UniProtKB/Swiss-Prot annotation:
This is S-adenosylmethionine synthase. It comes from Thermoanaerobacter pseudethanolicus (strain ATCC 33223 / 39E). Pfam families: S-AdoMet_synt_C (PF02773), S-AdoMet_synt_M (PF02772), S-AdoMet_synt_N (PF00438). The gene is metK. GO terms for cellular component: cytoplasm. Catalyzes the formation of S-adenosylmethionine (AdoMet) from methionine and ATP. The overall synthetic reaction is composed of two sequential steps, AdoMet formation and the subsequent tripolyphosphate hydrolysis which occurs prior to release of AdoMet from the enzyme. GO terms for molecular function: ATP binding; magnesium ion binding; methionine adenosyltransferase activity. It is found in: Cytoplasm.
Length: 395
C-alpha cells in the first residue's frame, strides 16, 4: 500500500522559534547559577518588541534583557531594516514567583507525604502538573526518527548555514521547510515534494533564489536515490518573501510543538517544552518517553514504538506507561510494557537524575528539533539500555 506523509520545520529566525530560543536561553542562564530553580518562562515577539513573562522562583539574578538581545543577535536580526534589531528592540519583562500551591506538590511528592517513598530511595519530586506525554522512535533513519521531519529539519538548518557562512548572503533569518515522503508498505521509498520558503533581500529575483536554493540547500540534503523526475520542488511559491520574522508575524513560545517533536508522525500530549525547568513533566517526561522508545527500537524489540506516559500533579509515580508498537513488536506490547517498568524509573525525580536534566542544555534544542540530534550529546538520545532490554525480552 502506498501513502504520503508530510512534515515541516522552521529556521531559527521564525518568530515562534525566536521565542522558544529566548525562553530556553533564559532557562539555561538560570540553571547555570541555580540548578534547582523553578522556571516557566514565556516569550512573545512582534515588530521591535520582546515580551518575557512567566513564573520564576530562584535565588540568582539573571540579566534578562541582555540574554534576549544576545539570542536575537546570534539568530541574525542585527539591522533595523529587517524589522527587528537586537540592539534597538524593546524588551519588557513581567515575572512572578511560582504558585506556592504548585510548589507544595512538587517539593514533596504525595507518596513521600504518606510515607510510601523514603527520601533515601529517591529525592521525591511530584509531577509539576497533570498531563500526558508521548515518545516515539522508528527505524526509518539512522537517528531512529521519521524521515519527513528529519529531512525538513536538515533543510531548515542548511538554510541557516548558507546564510551565515555567506554562500547565500542575501538570505535573511526567517524560513520554513516542508517535505512529503511516499511510503510503500510502511517504508519510505521516495520524496514526493519539497517546499522551501526563505526570507531574502528585496533586490534578489525569484529565479536566482530558486536556482540557488535547489543547488545549495535541497541537493546537499535530500538523498539522490529519494528524488526522481516526478518529485515536485517549490521554492518561495508566492514569488517573494522579503518581510518576515517578527515584522511579518508575531511569535509565541510553544507554538511549534509538532516541529519540536515528530512532525505529526506520532501523537502529542499538547504540552510545549521551551522555557520549562525539568520538574515540568511536559518536558522531562517527553524526553524520557523518547529515551524509552528509542532504546526499544535500537534493541530490535520493535521497528516502531510509541510510548505514552501520564501523571497527576504532586504524584511521583506515572499513572500510565503505555506501549504501542503498531504490530511491529518481536514480543507483545504488554510484555514490553512490563520490561520498561523494570528497566526505566519514570518518576520525575528519577528522570531528572538519570538524564541529568538540571543542566543548561536547552537553548541548543530550541531550534531544529529536540529529538534525533546526532550533532548534540543529548542524554535522552543515548541507547544505553539496549543490552538489558534484549536480555529481558529474550532476543
Amino acid at each position: 500500500m502506498r501513502r504520503l506523509f508530510t512534515s515541516e520545520s522552521v529556521t531559527e529566525g521564525h518568530p515562534d522559534k525566536i521565542c522558544d530560543q529566548i525562553s530556553d536561553a533564559i532557562l539555561d542562564e538560570i540553571l547555570k547559577k541555580d540548578p534547582y530553580a523553578r522556571v516557566a518562562c514565556e516569550t512573545a515577539v512582534t515588530t521591535g518588541l520582546v515580551l518575557v513573562m512567566g513564573e520564576i522562583t530562584t535565588q540568582c539574578y539573571v540579566d534578562i534583557p541582555k540574554v534576549v538581545r544576545k539570542v536575537v543577535e546570534e539568530i541574525g536580526y542585527t539591522r533595523a531594516k529587517f524589522g527587528f534589531d537586537a540592539d534597538t528592540c524593546a524588551v519588557i519583562t513581567s515575572i512572578d514567583e511560582q504558585s506556592p500551591d504548585i510548589a507544595l506538590g512538587v517539593d514533596k511528592a504525595l507518596e513521600a507525604k504518606r510515607g510510601e517513598l523514603s527520601d533515601s530511595e529517591i529525592e521525591a519530586i511530584g509531577a509539576g502538573d497533570q498531563g500526558l506525554m508521548f515518545g516515539f522512535a522508528c527505524d526509518e533513519t539512522e537517528e531512529l526518527m521519521p524521515m519527513p521531519i528529519m529531512l525538513a529539519h536538515k533543510l531548515a538548518r542548511r538554510l541557516a548555514e548558507v546564510r551565515k557562512n555567506g554562500t547565500l548572503s542575501y538570505l535573511r533569518p526567517d524560513g520554513k521547510t516542508q517535505v512529503t515522503v511516499e511510503y510503500e508498505d510502511d517504508k519510505p521509498v521516495r520524496v514526493d515534494s519539497v517546499v522551501v520558503s526563505a526570507q531574502h533581500a528585496p533586490e534578489i529575483d525569484h529565479d536566482t533564489i530558486e536556482r540557488d536554493i535547489i543547488e545549495h540547500v535541497i541537493k546537499p540534503i535530500i538523498p539522490e536515490n529519494m528524488i526522481d523526475d516526478k518529485t515536485k520542488i517549490f521554492v518561495n511559491p508566492t514569488g517573494r518573501f522579503v518581510i518576515g520574522g517578527p515584522q511579518g508575524d508575531s511569535g509565541l513560545t510553544g507554538r511549534k510543538i509538532i516541529v519540536d517533536t515528530y512532525g505529526g508522525y506520532a501523537r502529542h500530549g499538547g504540552g510545549a517544552f521551551s522555557g520549562k525547568d525539568p520538574t515540568k513533566v511536559d518536558r522531562s517526561a517527553s524526553y524520557a518517553a523518547r529515551y524509552v522508545a528509542k532504546n526499544i527500537v535500537a534493541a530490535g524489540l520493535a521497528k516502531k514504538c510509541e510510548v505514552q506516559l501520564a501523571y497527576a500533579i504532586g504524584v511521583a509515580t506515572p499513572l500510565e506507561i503505555g506501549i504501542d508498537t503498531f504490530g511491529t513488536g518481536k514480543i507483545s506490547d504488554e510484555k514490553i510494557s512490563e520490561i520498561v517498568k523494570q528497566v526505566f524509573d519514570l518518576r520525575p525525580a528519577a528522570i531528572i537524575r538519570d538524564l541529568d536534566l538540571r543542566r543548561p542544555i536547552y537553548r541548543q534544542v530550541a531550534a531544529y528539533g529536540h529529538f534525533g540530534r546526532h550533532d548534540l550529546d543529548l542524554p535522552w538520545e543515548k541507547t544505553d539500555k539496549v543490552d538489558i532490554l534484549k536480555k529481558l525480552a529474550g532476543i
